[in-house]
Amino acid sequence: MIIYVIIAFVAILIGMAISVSAFGTGGKRKKIFQDIYFSVEDVDGIGVLYTKTGEYSAILKMENPVQKYSANIDSYYEFNHLVTALAQTLGEGYAIHKQDVFVRKQFHDESNDNHEFLSESYFKYFNGRSYTDSKTYLIITQENKKSRIFSFDSKKWRDFVVKIRKVKDQLKDSGVEASYLDGNTAREYVDRYFSMNFNDKVVSMTNFKVDEESICMGNKRCKVYSLVDVDCVSTPSIVRPFTNIEVNNVSMPVDMVSLVDSIPSADVVVYNQMFFIPNQKRELSLLDKKKNRHASMPNPSNQIAVEDIKKVQDVIARENKQLVYAHFNLVVGVPIDADIQKCTNHLENSFGRLGIHISKRAYNQLELFVNSFPGNCYSTNPEYDRFLTLSDAAACLMYKERIQHSEETPLKIYYTDRQGVPVAIDISGKEGKNKITDNSNFFCLGPSGSGKSFHMNSVVRQMWEQNTDVVMVDTGNSYEGLCEYVGGKYISYTDEHPITMNPFAIKREELNIEKIGFLKNLVMLIWKGTQGEVTKTEDRLIEQVITEYFDEYFMKKQIENLSFNTFYEYSKVRIPQIIKENNLAG
């Protein structure tokens, strides 16, 4: 009996050993998130992430430079040039990891202002409407090539600090708004990525579960889609940074991967775009060896490979292009009860139309998710997660567009964007953060029935609510009701009561060279007409009369009031005197 018990006990132990050997104890998976970061520290206001594998990283929050639906083809190419320039600046041993985050939100008026009735009704109409918001982060990571991660290299650290500052300056010079996250903000961003929660003020993580198809966390389910299957790369032979869509039978350029911001059922989407910059000489040498290996075994497929490698080598030699290893993936989050297969079908169909067939073998869901943490991109497997390409070709697969946000301006005029939610625009061009002009006058022109009055009534009402003085000139009495509503002054021209003006009625502080010049030109126009010629003597004469006229009023108090009539009476007396005093002829 004792022998049977011993045999049974040994069998259980052997079974447990086999189970642990095959499947692990669960501890490794449980601690996988604890093994990413060593610390996050502030260095001169920049939050630097230190991974346990010895990499340094800094996170830039930026705005993509291409306005969505701007139809500006040049701006897409300019972004490509910018990305390749950043890669050239960083050089060997660095990685560029760009994360574009798209979040479904419900619109709520957050201005906390006491609106007038019409504005209150306006915002109430849009309250709760769904829209997609986007944010962009650029993570610069320095690779640690040594096995001993605790050996500090001051030279590499200085190089990292210099390079990240160069990147920010380069973005700024290209007109891209960018700023580094500090330590606390960087920690918060990492936590938000971990929980895939970029919406709530407070984030938490509950009930984390992973299988081959998806990752469940709390009340949402996420799936990671790898864009390129390294074992069977299926991408177009020629790519460009934009694609065309048809709008009213007219082609319009949009981002090549613009589909990532409109995935059905998705509450949150993170598009990870990673560039790894290798040693160029070594990669060219490996390419040459690969070409020779294919050439040594003559068959059609090897011959095609040889020709492709030759083309790449020619482009690199002729145009000084840079080789990079790239990885792209999408982390798509949906409600726990939603069918994530709809997202899969949408992505497969949409990318298929672009000639890109996304990987169907992304069974390493947890690995892809963890490797996409900010600063952890070097954990991606070089064998099956990265593919070699040219930097400008890889940049074509980056997301380049920005969704319209409200401008930072004290004068907010609200319009609805293409998603149907209000955004604040500074139409004056001079009050906002980005100054465009110092002249806020504008002209509204359109055919009858095109909506001029409807538009301008809305604009003027919003300006009035923000204590802005508005002077309007209009034909048709379209704004009489608005003027009465806000208690304005309405001046209307009729034959019986024409509009009059008194340009001479000014205050002492308003009298300057510009004002005298204006009045001189006005007098000359009345005197000579539009086609008349004015001599230098006449010009000086009228200028002197105007100057003395105002001196008589402001200084000597000899004129009762300022008007064209009193100026005319003064001129009739004074002009002959000046002519006589200076012996002027003509």
Identify the meaning behind each predicted range:
Residues 389, 393-398, 403-420:
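Pre-P-loop entry segment of helicase/translocase ATPase cores
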